[in-house]
A protein has these predicted regions:
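Non-catalytic, topology-defining segments of multipass membrane proteins
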Residues: 2-200, 204, 209, 231-321
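Interfacial helix-loop-helix junctions of multi-pass membrane proteins
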Residues: 214, 218-225, 249
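Short, mixed-charge amphipathic alpha-helical segments
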Residues: 224-232
């Protein structure tokens, strides 16, 4: 295996580390941790207290599972961040606006389906990159790497935080995507471009929802999501659970359709962690733009030549009666 391979980057899961993760995976925030400090401490602060306690109690050496991120917490790094709620609400409002002001309902539905497939793949690549302990101290993505990797240590953090927290975790990447696609690629004035970009953002938020629900106990899982999981439209707990066992599979968090091809590439075809990082950067800055270049002529043919527009408008009208 070449130097800088992904298999070398991610330490093996030892029996001791797997037992430690399993011990914490179904636990609520410990009462002792919740009471440490101000009694009115919110969930983000309580999780950070728990992270510090776990780091302080863990004895390891370089190469051990989770050693790098635990060491960073010991050195004072903060894992879970307070997000800017107004910014997230602005993103939500703009996403709805961008979809509703697209060329047509049929165009928006097509864009939603295409970006739904794309975001599952993009999320898997992002997951591979942010799971890499060698990237913990890289500029721009280091903080996200720390939070991603600590999710392996405290998997329940995604269920004890409400969905607003999970959605707001995307503030940075959503801002970057909107900045690139709306400003650099003329999406501010092009309703078709804007609609596709906003559909991609909507699917990114759906990915956060799917990830959170995959961690929920069956009795607490939303019944609509449970149906979508059964239909294969949202990632199932079984698929995502495989990721938490070995960390070398189960990377997608939206539908999971890309799990098999991405896992094959990760294990056998693309060994270099730097190639995955390059793919992540390329998709972040050019993925949606490339998708739009692919979709626009396809949509024009389907709507004008294929007669999809009238069919979808007829379906929408009948469904409202």
């Amino acid at each position: 295996m070449c130097i800088g391979s992904v298999s070398a980057a991610i330490p093996p899961v030892t029996a001791a580390s797997a037992e430690a993760v399993a011990q914490h995976s179904s636990m609520p925030v410990p009462e002792s941790d919740a009471q440490d400090g101000d009694a009115s401490m919110d969930i983000v602060d309580r999780l950070n207290v728990q992270a510090k306690h776990l780091a302080a109690k863990t004895i390891g050496v370089p190469g051990d599972e989770h050693y790098a991120c635990l060491q960073m917490v010991k050195e004072g790094a903060t894992v879970f961040k307070h997000r800017i709620w107004p910014l997230m609400y602005i993103y939500w409002a703009y996403t709805v606006y961008g979809i509703l002001t697209g060329p047509s309902l049929a165009f928006a539905l097509g864009a939603f389906v295409l970006t739904y497939l794309y975001i599952d793949l993009y999320g898997a690549v992002l997951h591979i990159v942010l799971d890499n302990p060698n990237f913990l101290k890289l500029p721009l993505i280091g903080e996200a790497c720390l939070e991603f990797q600590f999710h392996h240590i405290i998997p329940h953090e995604i269920t004890v935080r409400d969905f607003r927290h999970i959605a707001a975790d995307l503030n940075g990447i959503i801002g970057l995507e909107y900045g690139v696609n709306l400003i650099l690629f003329n999406g501010l004035t092009d309703p078709a471009y804007r609609c596709v970009a906003c559909c991609a953002v909507l699917n990114a938020y759906l990915g956060q929802l799917a990830h959170r629900q995959a961690h929920m106990r069956p009795e607490k899982r939303d019944p609509v999501v449970a149906v979508l999981q059964g239909l294969g439209l949202m990632v199932t707990p079984d698929t995502h659970r495989r990721h938490h066992k070995t960390y070398d599979q189960g990377f997608p968090i939206l539908s999971g359709w890309s799990d098999a091809p991405v896992t094959f590439l990760y294990r056998y075809v693309v060994p270099s962690q730097w190639v995955w990082l390059a793919m992540f950067v390329l998709l972040t800055f050019g993925g949606i733009a490339g998708l739009i270049r692919l979709y626009l002529p396809l949509a024009a043919w389907a709507l004008e030549e294929g007669g999809c527009e009238g069919a979808i408008r007829g379906w929408a009208k009948s469904s409202m009666l």
